[in-house]
Amino acid sequence: MNAHTGTVRGKERYRSGVMEYKRMGYWEPDYTPKDTDVIALFRVTPQEGVDPIEASAAVAGESSTATWTVVWTDRLTAAEKYRAKCHRVDPVPGTPGSYFAYIAYDLDLFEPGSIANLSASIIGNVFGFKPLKALRLEDMRFPVAYVKTFQGPATGIVVERERLDKFGRPLLGATVKPKLGLSGRNYGRVVYEALKGGLDFTKDDENINSQPFMHWRDRFLYCIEAVNRAQAASGEVKGTYLNITAGTMEDMYERAEFAKELGSCIVMIDLVIGYTAIQSMAKWARRNDMILHLHRAGHSTYTRQKSHGVSFRVIAKWMRLAGVDHIHAGTVVGKLEGDPNTTRGYYDVCREDFNPTKLEHGLFFDQSWASLNKMMPVASGGIHAGQMHQLLDLLGEDVVLQFGGGTIGHPMGIAAGAIANRVALEAMILARNEGRDYVHEGPEILAKAAQTCTPLKSALEVWKDVTFNYQSTDTPDFVPTALETV
């Protein structure tokens, strides 16, 4: 027995019966993670009376090689190598009864290039473990050797901007509203008006697929006609995210191929199709020179609560590995969940070549992306022209700002809504480039631009009092310096 950790060694471990996880080698406080280890950070909330170290060791065991009792077949494997090792447990600041558990996994435990296999190990079974009241996967670190087994984003931010010939500003988009019920012809009219008015993209919503009121093929035809007409009228490259999400991969490939035949530069999928389907469509997009947009439909069912589930920063990392080009990552100021610092962390994951540890953004590890392309984050949900200075300041320029209701809900019409957003953006970019303090002068800059733009003036008046000031449920908890081990 190891006197320091209480770990049972050698033949003693293989007595029949049940043994504590921390005595089976899943708790190794002296272990130093290797550069080639995958590291996961869990927020562990044990049941009353359960030792936090035992609970954390159980997470390590149940997400790697352990089961509920000693098994003799462990002696047929390199058990010391393949056991996940919980090497650090810290109390979560300000949250009594919860602990951050750092767990290292040998790289050989994972199939190269497979998010499905990775997630099956890390979150596949352990979240239902009875000794745990709650469990959340907060962050992960992937070694370069593992990152290089994935293709990464099919197109990337740089190539996307080159294809669109649009630089130095955020891209503008809008989700077609109402999301359900429009005929194909009327849907196409919305797309045309929005693009002609100055937007770069329009977008299908997550649940518009192929329903009785509008077959997918009709939608594709009318939308691409609208894109072509808007391009001819504006002289700019335009696009619309055609949602190819369907019930089978065969149907999705059929829709993607038809979108390509029509000349679309981008297709869209939903997160709910699953990790394998996402990777399959990312490979198709790369082979066919298409931009791949991912709507994070369904994510809040497991990302929103702080105590249980999977943090969206982990989903963002998985999706960058998987190969999507766009991902919805929050707005901070809109109607959807988004703590400012936490959201900045998501954007860091999307857009940086190397993520340094940044605890205030919820990033617990250094992460190299090994030359994988960058993802374009998308801000969507409850934003409008009057927030343009805040959006530019908080989110930067490599982002798609999607004003759905803020375009289609404009009192003067869809084209006027698009004009208002484009003029507001151009005014703010000009002010930034001139070196002005556009963050504090934002309302003044917008008011001046509105003097010569009636649609913007109307937008500022209609939505001047619209705010979504609610307390975020997912704020970063972090340990500024290493605390004493529990």
UniProtKB/Swiss-Prot annotation:
This protein's encoding gene: cbbL
E.C. number(s) listed in UniProt: 4.1.1.39
Role description: RuBisCO catalyzes two reactions: the carboxylation of D-ribulose 1,5-bisphosphate, the primary event in carbon dioxide fixation, as well as the oxidative fragmentation of the pentose substrate. Both reactions occur simultaneously and in competition at the same active site.
Binding site for substrate: N125, T175, K179, R296, H328, S380
Biological source species: Bradyrhizobium diazoefficiens (strain JCM 10833 / BCRC 13528 / IAM 13628 / NBRC 14792 / USDA 110)
Swiss-Prot/TrEMBL keywords: Calvin cycle, Carbon dioxide fixation, Lyase, Magnesium, Metal-binding, Monooxygenase, Oxidoreductase
Catalytic residues identified in the record: K177, H295
Cofactor binding description: Binds 1 Mg(2+) ion per subunit.
Gene3D superfamilies hit by this protein: Ribulose bisphosphate carboxylase, large subunit, C-terminal domain, RuBisCO large subunit, N-terminal domain
Further comment: The basic functional RuBisCO is composed of a large chain homodimer in a 'head-to-tail' conformation. In form I RuBisCO this homodimer is arranged in a barrel-like tetramer with the small subunits forming a tetrameric 'cap' on each end of the 'barrel'.
Keyword Cytoplasm applies: no
Record's protein name: Ribulose bisphosphate carboxylase large chain
